[in-house]
Structures are given as structure tokens and as C-alpha cells.
């Protein structure tokens, strides 16, 4: 995550306090870097033994964009921040705050196990080994980006193949193909060690090209990529029941918006996938008229600022349907209908979000107009943000429908809860008591109702509404009811790990208290789903006399994410493990307790080192220097491959090595 990257900021001021604002200026290609960020082996940026000149810089200086540049100068200052220089032509969008970066590409930087350097001048490869004498070991290098290429292929099935350090691509008119039950281990990486020009910094990733339509990727594992997990440029493809984790450890020089899964085609379906531990700020850019459903996503956007799990930009909102997803424990927005540069009129419209759960995220951000936001449960939003934000800017969202949502805070502003013209806007939907049916606009420091002559004014009154929502803000608003503790209305217990069942309704305050609107929205044909009325666009079956408020009906159960157990290549004990228990899934990098098919690494630096308290089997086991492993009395640890112990293993029970 960013916590392990160096940091620094320019000393210029942003033109706005809008967190979505992007500054396209570059300050002469120079960057200040903090001296107190340390490199493990050489003492820190400020150490005169560390010269960054001639290195490769991976610079997250564009908020949600990261660039790979050649460092052309490094001025070391003993009493102040150092300055590095680079060619400004090597970067795109520049933002003057929240800078993170790391450097590589020099032999002198090698100081940690498994680091390597290639000297182009004499074609020599240097490796800092994890253990042992390299003369007795085999070192392999990646030579092929794509081991399988579909070119004009149709009705081909690729099934049960393990891809290691390679992947596939579909080009030409490759249609109706299936990739199923395949494992993609380290499928893509950049070639920037060879240089930063001619596209070497951009990884060649798993891709369905612009004329690859009606294909299916199902029940596959994608892990430890550099670059996007998937790029999809064709139409009506289905990405279903897959497992993605540890996606993109540099997030640099990616395509377009720079996301983890990049779609530009039309009518693609992304459903029942599990995603966790990603680098890029946004997780899924969906393409036009997409369906995003039954996905489970957590721990995203670790290497860039801004972002969302579902990132609906201007052209990708209309016709999108986002439903029955579970997003939790990420610093990013769970779902966002977005607009560039703070201009709400540039946002997309006619999107639908219904029956979603978000817990401990940056919430749900809705810009634009004519959106349908219904039956969502959004809790514990971070950064003092409102859980559901129906943004009231530039006369927008007055034709948006908001109903049967349960949240702690629902507002028209990112964080404010006053809902007054003199402070921050009232809720923008038409029909609000005492409000405007034409939306609101901010002039100087105050808000007012939109009127004829305003740049964003629409002479047709808004047709949206707010009905039967509940939150914890004790301020009167149409369609919103106050409750002091919404978690108490649910089967909520996050202490045992978050699951979908935590959000089942248990209180009569939300059971049978919803509405089932049959209104037909204006321009109903622009929505995805089976319209034209709201009850068709947002399908919902009542368990009782009326709809329940929130994502679930009482007695209803639905699950998200992949429904199978992946065969991970490597599983690492987390240095942030919350306990010493080997059999606790959250203590492992994959979020799953390892089994006999997995290669296990126990690293140094964990505050809780693993203890085996019941018999287990693994494939290969490596205990790094300064790491420990304890096997309790009466249990057996079986290693079916190689055991490499550079640390300390305490055996009170039994250990069997069957290599």
C-alpha cells in the first residue's frame, strides 16, 4: 500500500478544495521528496550514498494516475527536501498533492531478498537471493507475454490450464469463446527495466480486443499481476465467478483511466466475482450499458488516490445496472456515478443502483441526473463522508429517484448534514417540501434554487422523488426518517467478520415499511433492465405486506462473489495478522486458509507469528530470516515439497517433510 511508498508534495496550492479536481500543470518536471522516508538497506532518501539520478521513478503524481519516468537529476539537500527532475513529456495528468513514488533500475538499490537488476550495457542479470548459493539454483525469466492467442477464433474452449508468467489475448473477430477454470499466476509485468520509452513501461495484459464479442471468462483465478487483471474492448462479454487478488503492484502506465479491470465495450456483464487487494484507484471501469452484480470486493485502490470500486464515468452511466453487490473495508467509494472536473452536468445519467451493500467504504456517490437509487444498505462510511451522496450541484439530480435505502447518513453534499441554502444544499430531488423542483446551484458561498438564466437550468421541472429512506441524521427531509441506530435494525455483528447475513433486517422499523413505486420515469427507455416502470426497472419481491427497507427482505438470502475455492500459487502470512492462529483466514494474504496445494511463506516483521494448533498439510514452506513458526504438541505439519527454514521453527508436535 501507499504506506510503504515514499511521499512528497509540491508547495503550490490547488485551485479548488474539490477532492475530484485535477490540476494539469507540471512544475518544470521537478518534485520535492521527503528525506525521512527510509530505504531498508541504504538508510534513506537523504543519505548521500543513495543517488537517484539515472534511475527509474514510478510516480503517483496524478491522483488516480501513475507514471514511469527516467530520473534525469537528483539534488540532495542536507537540511531540506531533496529534488528530483524528469522529462515532463513523460507524464500526463499532474496533480499538486498526494504524491507517492518509488525508484528502481540501479544496481546500488539492491538490498532486499528477491530484488534484481538487469544491466543493459553488458546484458548481466543481478539477483539478491532469498537464501542459499545461486550457483545451485535455477533462475527463470519471462520471455513470452502471450502463450495463447485467439485470432478470429470462434466457439473455442480453453479449460483447466495453469498459466505461469504468461497469459492469453483475443484479437480479430474472436467470438463465442470460453476460458474456464484456468489459473493465471503472475500473468503480466512491465518491461521498464529495459527502458521507459516505446511502451516498455506498459504491461501486455490479459485482453479481449475490440472485435472480441460474446466471450466468457468463468471460474478463473487471476493473482499477482502487474498491470490490469483484464482489459475488455469487445461487446457482450461475460466475466463470471472469477477470483481476483493482488492485482497490480505498481499501477503505472495503465490504459485510459488506469483501473484494475478496464472495459470500453458495450453490454458487458461482470457478476459473481471476488476481488481483493488491488493497486489502481478504481477497480472496475464497466463500459457502456454494463451489468455489475453479485460481486464481493474489498481492500482496493491501495496505490493511488481518489477512485471507486464501480467507476461510472460520463459515457458509462446510461443503461448501467449495479445490483446485489457487497463492498466492504476499502478506502474508496463503493459505487460512483462520476463527472469530470466538478461539473455535474458532465456526469452520465439514467443509471440504476439497487440492492447493494457497502460497509466501511467511502460510500456511494451519485452525480448527474435521472438516476435510480433503491434498496441499498450503506453503513460506516469513512472520512466523515455521507454514506449516500445525491450530489446537489449545477441543478442536477432533481429527476433522480431515491427510495427504500438504509444508511447512517444520506445527504446532498459529501459531508455536510445541514441541508440549508445558507450552508449546504437541500436534497435535490423534486417534490421536497419547501424546496425547488428545478434543483440547486451554489453561488459564492451560498446555495439557491436554480432559475431561468442559469447555465445549467432546465425549464422542465424535475420528476424524481425521495421516499421511505432511513438514516441517523435528525434533520427533517422529504422521504427520510430518522433513526438513532440503524445497525440495531439489522442482524449486524462485524466482530466475527463481515458477511451478507449481517445486513438482514430484524426490526419492524424497516420490515414492511418500504414503498413499491410504479411510476414510469421520463425517458424510461434510456435505462437498463426491463422497464418501463420503477417496479420493473428495480425488481423486488415483498416477503410481507410491503417492501422492506434496505438491501434484503426478511427471510431472504443472497450471496456474492466466487462460489469455489481457488488453487493459489503462493500464500503469505500477513505481517498485520490479527492473531497467531494458522487457521484464521484473515491472517493470510489470500483471505483463505492454505491447504496442501499451496506454497507458503512466513515473512519477518509480523507482530503475531503463526502457531499450528491442528494438523495441516502444505506444498512448499519457506520461513524467512527472523520469522518464526510454532507447531503445538499433538499436531503434525506435513510439507509435501521443500522446507526452507531461514528463521526458527519450534516443534512441540511433529513435522513431516515428504519431498
Q: Model-predicted segments: where are they?
A:
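Extracellular beta-strand-rich solenoid/capping regions of secreted or surface-exposed proteins
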Residues: 140-157, 165-175, 203-211, 231-232, ...
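Beta-propeller domains
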Residues: 87-97, 104-105, 131-154, 164-170, ...
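Extracellular beta-sheet-rich ligand-binding/adhesion modules
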Residues: 569-659
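Predominantly extracellular beta-rich ligand-binding scaffolds that present long acidic/polar faces
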Residues: 342-507, 520
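Extracellular polysaccharide-degrading/modifying enzymes targeting complex plant/algal/animal polysaccharides
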Residues: 1-204, 251, 463-466, 498-507, ...
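Surface-exposed loop/turn motifs in large extracellular/passenger domains
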Residues: 149-157, 175-178, 188, 203-216, ...
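Short glycine/acidic-rich loop motifs that flank beta-strands on beta-rich extracellular proteins
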Residues: 166-170, 188-196, 202-205, 226-233, ...
Amino acid at each position: 500500500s501507499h504506506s510503504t511508498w515514499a511521499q512528497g508534495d509540491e508547495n503550490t496550492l490547488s485551485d479548488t478544495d474539490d477532492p475530484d479536481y485535477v490540476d494539469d500543470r507540471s512544475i518544470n518536471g521537478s518534485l520535492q521528496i521527503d528525506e525521512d522516508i527510509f530505504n531498508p538497506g541504504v538508510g534513506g532518501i537523504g543519505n548521500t550514498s543513495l543517488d537517484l539520478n539515472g534511475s527509474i521513478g514510478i510516480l503517483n503524481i496524478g491522483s488516480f494516475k501513475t507514471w514511469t519516468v527516467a530520473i534525469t537529476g537528483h539534488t540532495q539537500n542536507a537540511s531540506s527536501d531533496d529534488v528530483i527532475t524528469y522529462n515532463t513529456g513523460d507524464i500526463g495528468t499532474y496533480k499538486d498533492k498526494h504524491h507517492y513514488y518509488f525508484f528502481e533500475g540501479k544496481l546500488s538499490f539492491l538490498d532486499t531478498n528477491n530484488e534484481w537488476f538487469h544491466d543493459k550495457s553488458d546484458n548481466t542479470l543481478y539477483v539478491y537471493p532469498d537464501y542459499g548459493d545461486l550457483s545451485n539454483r535455477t533462475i527463470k525469466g519471462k520471455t513470452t507475454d502471450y502463450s495463447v492467442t485467439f485470432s478470429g477464433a470462434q466457439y473455442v474452449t480453453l479449460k483447466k490450464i495453469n498459466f505461469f508468467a504468461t497469459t492469453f489475448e483475443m484479437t480479430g473477430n474472436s467470438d463465442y469463446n470460453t476460458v474456464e477454470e484456468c489459473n493465471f499466476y503472475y500473468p503480466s509485468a512491465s518491461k521498464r527495466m529495459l527502458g521507459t520509452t516505446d511502451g516498455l513501461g506498459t504491461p501486455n495484459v490479459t485482453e479481449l480486443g475490440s472485435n472480441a464479442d460474446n466471450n466468457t471468462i468463468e471460474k478463473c483465478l487471476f493473482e499477482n499481476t502487474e498491470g490490469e487483471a483484464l482489459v475488455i474492448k469487445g461487446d457482450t462479454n461475460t466475466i463470471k465467478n472469477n477470483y481476483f487478488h493482488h492485482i497490480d503492484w505498481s499501477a503505472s502506465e495503465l490504459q485510459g483511466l488506469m483501473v484494475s479491470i478496464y472495459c470500453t465495450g458495450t453490454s458487458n456483464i461482470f457478476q459473481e466475482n471476488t476481488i481483493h487487494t488491488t493497486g489502481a484507484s478504481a477497480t472496475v471501469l464497466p463500459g457502456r450499458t454494463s451489468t455489475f452484480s453479485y460481486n464481493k470486493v474489498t481492500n482496493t485502490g491501495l496505490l493511488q488516490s481518489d477512485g471507486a470500486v464501480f467507476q461510472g464515468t460520463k459515457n458509462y452511466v446510461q443503461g448501467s445496472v449495479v445490483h446485489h453487490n457487497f463492498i466492504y473495508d476499502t478506502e474508496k467509494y463503493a459505487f460512483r456515478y462520476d463527472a469530470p472536473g466538478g461539473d455535474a452536468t458532465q456526469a452520465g445519467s439514467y443509471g440504476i443502483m439497487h440492492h447493494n451493500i457497502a460497509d466501511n467504504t467511502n460510500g456511494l456517490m451519485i452525480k448527474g441526473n435521472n438516476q435510480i437509487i433503491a434498496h441499498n444498505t450503506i453503513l460506516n462510511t469513512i472520512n466523515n463522508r455521507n454514506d449516500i451522496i445525491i450530489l446537489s450541484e449545477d441543478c442536477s439530480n432533481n429527476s433522480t429517484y431515491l427510495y427504500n435505502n438504509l444508511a447512517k447518513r444520506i445527504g446532498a453534499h459529501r459531508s455536510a448534514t445541514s441541508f440549508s441554502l445558507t450552508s449546504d444544499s437541500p436534497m435535490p430531488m423534486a417534490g421536497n417540501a419547501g424546496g425547488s423542483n428545478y434543483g440547486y446551484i451554489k453561488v459564492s458561498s451560498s446555495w439557491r434554487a436554480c432559475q431561468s438564466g442559469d447555465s445549467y437550468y432546465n425549464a422542465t421541472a424535475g420528476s424524481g422523488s425521495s421516499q421511505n429512506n432511513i438514516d441517523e441524521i435528525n434533520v427533517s427531509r422529504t422521504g427520510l426518517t430518522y433513526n438513532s441506530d440503524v445497525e440495531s435494525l439489522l442482524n449486524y455483528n462485524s466482530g466475527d467478520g463481515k458477511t451478507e447475513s449481517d445486513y438482514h433486517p430484524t426490526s419492524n422499523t424497516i420490515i414492511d415499511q418500504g414503498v413499491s413505486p410504479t411510476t414510469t420515469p421520463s425517458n424510461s427507455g434510456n435505462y437498463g433492465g426491463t422497464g418501463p416502470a420503477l417496479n420493473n426497472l428495480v425488481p423486488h419481491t415483498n416477503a410481507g405486506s410491503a417492501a422492506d427497507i434496505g438491501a434484503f427482505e426478511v427471510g431472504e438470502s443472497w450471496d456474492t462473489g466466487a462460489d469455489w475455492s481457488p488453487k493459489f500459487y503462493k500464500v503469505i502470512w500477513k505481517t498485520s495478522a490479527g492473531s497467531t492462529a494458522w487457521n484464521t483466514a484473515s491472517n493470510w494474504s489470500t483471505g483463505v486458509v492454505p491447504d496442501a496445494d499451496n506454497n507458503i511463506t512466513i515473512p519477518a516483521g509480523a507482530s503475531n507469528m503463526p502457531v499450528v494448533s491442528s494438523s495441516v498439510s502444505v506444498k512448499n514452506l519457506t520461513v524467512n530470516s527472523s520469522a518464526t513458526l510454532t507447531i503445538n504438541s499433538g499436531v503434525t505439519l506435513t510439507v509435501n515439497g521443500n522446507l526452507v527454514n531461514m528463521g526458527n521453527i519450534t516443534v512441540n508436535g511433529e513435522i513431516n517433510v515428504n519431498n
